[in-house]
Amino acid sequence: GTTILQAARQVGIDIPTLCFLKDINEIGDCRMCIVQVDGRRGFATSCIQKVEEGMNVRTHSKEVIEARKVILDLILSNHQRDCLTCTRNGNCELQNLAVKFNVTGVEYEGEKNKHKIDDLSPSIVRDFNKCILCRRCVSVCKKVQKIGAIDCINRGFESCISTIGDHSLNDVNCTFCGQCIEACPVGALKEKDSTQEAWEKLKDPETYVIVQTAPAVRVALGEEFGMPIGTNVTGKMVSALKRLGFDKVFDTNTGADFTIMEEGTESVSYTHLRAHETVLDL
């Protein structure tokens, strides 16, 4: 059946969510999507509550809005609020909701969870001092990537998202695909940034610096500068990289072409060598 959230979105009514990811994470944990249903006590979680015939739903009543503000206050009370230096500043779902509901301060102050930052993996940094326990990363790892490298561990105040045994991502079956980063609504997960190291190398006159770009980059960069989606900016990209100080710019396609030719040649040679062994009698 259709949920209240789905029905509302179909008719253009905006109900805020934090933990919801369609078909991936529909658990109602964050409670931001609460609504009032006439004739029922308390609030209903719209992302999991099914629509029923004759149901009268209030999505933006005074009581609902006040309850959502309290929920935001509680989430922020255990959140590391260093928004100015956070990589998600301006692109954070929690921050956007705080602005939308005019939550400028935190009424519920108290003890906070303190977690070590895990930056041992080659590409992902985990800072669960910013985690809101929405479990979107857990669901996308299990259901989309079919890996299940992370899960919710411990209970109550000690609950956190981590690996089994609370090991680093570097020590479990994580493939470093980055899907968890894409799913995270806040700054708890981010790509490892090597920008400063690159600048240091570019400033060193004794270092010969090269850059290798993936094929997708040449058609993704243009969007950041207001160009139509899919615009090929290879020339502009190479010129910009050279002006930054890179001595050579290589395209990953070159290596891919070599690999295709080499593996294709090996396959043809193998087929010819084993041709006399092929049996097709039926």
Task: State where each predicted segment sits.
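Fe-S ferredoxin-like electron-transfer domains
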Residues: 31-176, 182, 189-204, 208
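Conserved small/polar residues in nucleotide/adenosyl-binding loops
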Residues: 271-278
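Flanking helices and flexible, charged tails adjoining ferredoxin-like Fe-S electron-transfer domains
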Residues: 162-269
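N-terminal cofactor/phosphate-binding cores enriched in small/glycine residues
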Residues: 2-53
